Amino acid sequence: EENTNALMTSCADALHFSMMSGDVKITNSLIEYSHDDALNIKHGYFYKVADADTSSYTFTFTRITTSMPLPNEGDKIAIYEESTFNSHGTYTVVSAKEENGKMLVKVKERIRNFNTWEASRVTFLSNTPNFVFSNNIVRNKRNRGILVQVPNAVIENNTFMNVGHGSIQAATAMDKFN
């Protein structure tokens, strides 16, 4: 703004995180004047369910996010219907391998009613960050405030002022919002 010390960055997001795991906490911060998002954190769009063999407890997935690793034994995955976000369950991985561009993932739990499922997506729960965004001020933004694309995020006690295109967009890897 003219005659002030306020400057807008020429880059897009002030904070942009991708493919993180562990604890990611942003607290007691002032974020302002970024060109696009004050914060964008993403991780979880993992695979699309291509098929399932319910007798062998094996899913066939195709990749959506190319850089996501295969799950290991004991990892947790969750499956959600694309159009409704309804859960098709959380599964524990027994084994996973890649064959001909597809992922074959054997799970511990029984796959129920697969023949009734609509198009569904998989979230790799064991490889997503524990995200906390609290006690922050996001202001003077011409675009979106924060874009959160990870499951189980905690967003609390923040102030959004002069944000042009919405304060919070939550697209959290198909989980539901409380």
Range-by-range predicted roles:
Residues 66-102:
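Ser/Thr/Gly-rich low-complexity blocks that favor extended beta-strand/coil architectures
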Residues 20-25, 129-132, 150-155:
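Short "repeat-start/strand-capping" segments in structured domains, especially the N-termini
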Residues 58-66:
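Short alpha-helix capping/helix-loop boundary micro-motifs
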Residues 2-13, 22, 35-41, 142-149, ...:
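Short glycine/acidic-rich loop motifs that flank beta-strands on beta-rich extracellular proteins
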Residues 87-132, 139, 147:
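Small/polar beta-strand repeat architecture
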